[in-house]
Swiss-Prot record:
The tankyrase-binding motif (also named TBD) is required for interaction with tankyrase TNKS and TNKS2. It is found in: Golgi apparatus membrane. The keyword Membrane applies. GO terms for molecular function: enzyme binding; ubiquitin protein ligase binding. One of its GO terms (biological process) is Golgi organization. This is Golgin-45. InterPro entries: Golgin-45 (IPR027095), Hsk3-like (IPR013183). The keyword Transmembrane does not apply. Residues 120-213 form a coiled coil. The modification Phosphoserine is found at residues 15, 49, 353. It comes from Homo sapiens. ADP-ribosylated by tankyrase TNKS and TNKS2. Poly-ADP-ribosylated protein is recognized by RNF146, followed by ubiquitination. Ubiquitinated by RNF146 when poly-ADP-ribosylated, leading to its degradation. Residues 1-58 are annotated as: Disordered. Residues 1-16 have a biased composition (Polar residues).
Length: 400
């Protein structure tokens, strides 16, 4: 920074001059002093200081600024400006140039002599003053920016407070109406959404009611079927117990008959052996039979041998005919077996011959008495719908 084209203007306003005679005379203050400093040649101008102190008035420490109004007066505080040394730069002019003060004071300065300040010192002072002014300006700009931000924030706060105040008082009808309109639109949207949800829930409720009816009918049909199956199971269990008892009785009687037939076989063998004493042995004891049929066949052979030994070979025509009117009575076990067969299958039991009293019925005849109640239609909307039909229904199911 150089001092080229540096111009400083100092203007001192004139103050009223008091006349003589009252003891408070004042001299005419110095007029406006225009000081222009620049780097010029020492050959043409003499070097004068632009920073010389003005000649004070007779009352030192009082600056006459003219007539001041009390209500417009302002207190001015002095602010000390500290400039760091690093911010100060020195610009040394050339030897052929010098700083010369171009301004001069008009008037007479009392008690002061005009002196010459060296160019380097004057230049450093000017630089310091300019740096202070720039720092002051920068700080003032920062303060201005901060104050403007505070003003903007305060304006926004005041606006919001005004809105709140107006809304609380109730004078701002437009704001109130806008709020009511927004709330109304929001309520309309919520009402539409609730209406759609209600419609969906009603549809779901209707579908669930249909499903409930279907499952109720299924439950009733299954309960009827369960009752029928329970009754059928009880009847089958009772028949099973009766058949088991009859079979046990038949086996017991058969075992008794087997023991008696074995004893009869032994007696017949002893009789036949004793009859052949002293004669040619035509019969010798064979292997013991392993079943009741073999035992009966063996006894029949022994009886024929004894008969031929005692009676000889007698013709068949000479044998006495056994009356055909003789009827055999059934044993208790046989009667029980016949009763069970008659209960299980009456028709087959009547048609069976007397030679085969222990006719075995097929498994399908055991469930012949079960009612036909489980009928289904293949083209229904819901699968496995059971129609409760009686056992007389034989027609075709038609879905309407």
């Amino acid at each position: 920074m150089t001092t080229k084209n540096l111009e400083t203007k100092v203007t001192v306003t004139s103050s009223p001059i008091r006349g003589a005679g009252d003891g408070m005379e004042t001299e005419e203050p110095p007029k406006s002093v225009e000081v222009t400093s620049g780097v010029q040649s020492r050959k043409h101008h003499s070097l004068q200081s632009p920073w010389k102190k003005a000649v004070p008035s007779e009352s030192p420490g009082v600056l006459q600024l003219g007539k001041m109004l009390t209500e417009k007066a302002m207190e001015v505080k002095a602010v000390r400006i500290l400039v760091p040394k690093a911010a100060i730069t020195h610009d040394i002019p050339n030897k052929n140039t010098k700083v010369k003060s171009l301004g001069h004071h008009k008037g007479e300065f009392l008690g002061q002599s005009e002196g010459v300040i060296e160019p380097n010192k004057e230049l450093s002072e000017v630089k310091n003053v300019l740096e202070k002014l720039k720092n002051s300006e920068r700080r003032l700009l920062q303060d201005k920016e901060g104050l403007s931000n505070q003003l903007r924030v305060q304006t926004e706060v005041n606006r919001e407070l005004k809105k709140l105040l107006v809304a609380s008082v109730g004078d701002d009808l437009q704001y109130h109406f806008e709020r009511l309109a927004r709330e109304k639109n929001q309520l309309i949207l919520e009402n539409e959404a609730l209406g759609r949800n209600t419609a969906q829930l009603s549809e779901q409720l209707e579908r669930m009611s249909i499903q409930c009816d279907v499952w109720r009918s299924k439950f009733l049909a299954s309960r009827v079927m369960a009752d029928e199956l329970t009754n059928s199971r009880a009847a089958l269990q009772r028949q099973n117990r009766d058949a088991h008892g009859a079979i046990q009785d038949l086996l017991s009687e058969r075992e008794q008959f087997r023991q008696e037939m074995i004893a009869t076989q032994k007696l017949l063998e002893e009789l036949l052996v004793s009859l052949q004493w002293g004669r040619e042995q035509t019969y010798s004891p064979s292997v013991q039979p392993h079943s009741t049929a073999e035992l009966a066949l063996t006894n029949h052979k022994l009886a024929k041998a004894v008969n031929s030994h005692l009676l000889g070979n007698v013709g068949i025509n000479n044998q006495k005919k056994i009356p055909s009117t003789v009827e055999f009575c059934s044993t208790p076990a046989e009667k029980m077996a016949e009763t069970v067969l008659r209960i299980l299958d009456p028709v087959t039991c009547k048609e069976s011959s007397p030679d085969n009293p222990f006719f075995e019925s097929s498994p399908t005849t055991l469930l012949a008495t079960k009612k036909n109640i489980g009928r289904f239609h293949p083209y229904t909307r819901y699968e496995n719908i059971t129609f409760n039909c009686c056992n007389h229904c034989r027609g075709e199911l038609i879905a309407l």
